[in-house]
A protein has these predicted regions:
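Short glycine-rich hinge loops at helix-strand junctions in the catalytic core
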Residues: 29
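Intrinsically disordered, low-complexity regulatory regions enriched in serine/threonine/proline
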Residues: 2-21, 32-44, 48-150
Length: 150
């Protein structure tokens, strides 16, 4: 998928907030460096700049991951948001049903979070000290919340 086709795909198939996030990335020194898969059933778009932002669509559900630098392991966005907040994972993302009232999965994860509003601050924060440890703490907290019989 060339950049023009990718642009059309975002405009026609992604939520408005995803479109705004991609526009912000492109306006702030990030470029589409790779793409795999096609269509809303499964595709990944990698944007490189000072950090690496990976946008994935899987069965019409949009996800975001961030790597501190291009090529590094990426962290899931919910973990970054919880870690950056300084609060526990459960405080940032209280338990909620994984499906909407009508049975549909949310279009964009984490549910209720605007990527466009939060990503600039996360990208500025992610290069700072102690980020890895904070993300690992959030990961442990999320795991404990998801464990059956907790």
């Amino acid at each position: 998928m060339n950049p023009l086709v990718a642009d059309e795909f975002f405009r026609s198939d992604s939520p408005v907030d995803v479109q705004a996030t991609v526009a912000w990335l492109l306006a702030n020194g990030y470029g589409l460096s790779s793409q795999s898969g096609e269509g809303a059933f499964g595709a990944r778009f990698v944007f490189r700049g000072p950090a690496e932002v990976r946008i994935t669509v899987d069965r019409s559900q949009w996800l975001l991951d961030v790597a501190v630098e291009p090529g590094a392991d990426a962290w899931q966005y919910d973990l970054l948001l919880a870690a950056r907040s300084g609060r526990t994972y459960g405080e940032v993302f209280p338990a909620r049903a994984s499906r909407q009232a009508d049975g549909r999965l949310p279009d964009q994860l984490p549910e209720g979070v605007s990527w466009r509003q939060t990503l600039p601050d996360v990208l500025a924060w992610v290069r700072g000290p102690g980020v890895g440890e904070a993300v690992e703490r959030a990961s442990r907290e999320r795991f404990a919340l998801m464990r059956p019989g907790r």
